Amino acid sequence: RVALHPADNKNLNREFPGDKNGTPTEQLAEFFTREFISKMDFLIDMHSGSWNQQLLPHVYSPFVDSEELDELTFEFAKATGMQHIVMYGERPRDPANSISYPNTAMTHGKPGLTTEIGHLGQSDEAFVEATLELSRNALYFLDMLPGEPTPHPAPVIYDKLKSVVSPVDGLFTPRVEIGSVVEKGTIVGEVRDYFGNVVTELTSPINGTVMMINETPPVKAGESPMTIGIEQEV
């Protein structure tokens, strides 16, 4: 619920392009679309893991089946200097039916990235510096500051993210860490009942890298406490 507006219980990043006559969240999305996206050339939507999530720093490089735009967006993503780049093509192509802030930018022909740095509501020096570094690189790429961007020398590209889903209610405990490389079938966590008894073990549905872990123990059946990234085949 950390991402929901208290007035209408909606997530801003799921209400684009918005509605000026809608709920408070829908009105805010419409304002961003009208006043920012219509006037910008590039967008970076900066996220973190908030208070409940641990994550491997990464950047989403969306694509909308427009060769020129998709290529420019990917070049922008690499220029940030972030090592882990997730290719993301599961958002709408129609600007009238977009979903998120970056998706709305993309449907208007403008590169829109999402970065994920930091976790558990912390603002320690390493996370702050990483965010400043990607910001400087982006400004170099856009010729808004003198200098050249420094792409990561060994970028890791992911084709898809896959959720690990709990079949039961309970308390989740991970058995792997962020950045762990796992094989399909590896036990990545367990769900216990309120008396501490193991109800089920959760396994990875794929070979991949652990990208996100929810650190708050309660989990409901059908929810995902962990996300695995599938690396692009070279």
Regions found by a protein language model. Name each.
Residues 1-234:
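Structured catalytic-domain cores with a bias toward divalent-metal coordination
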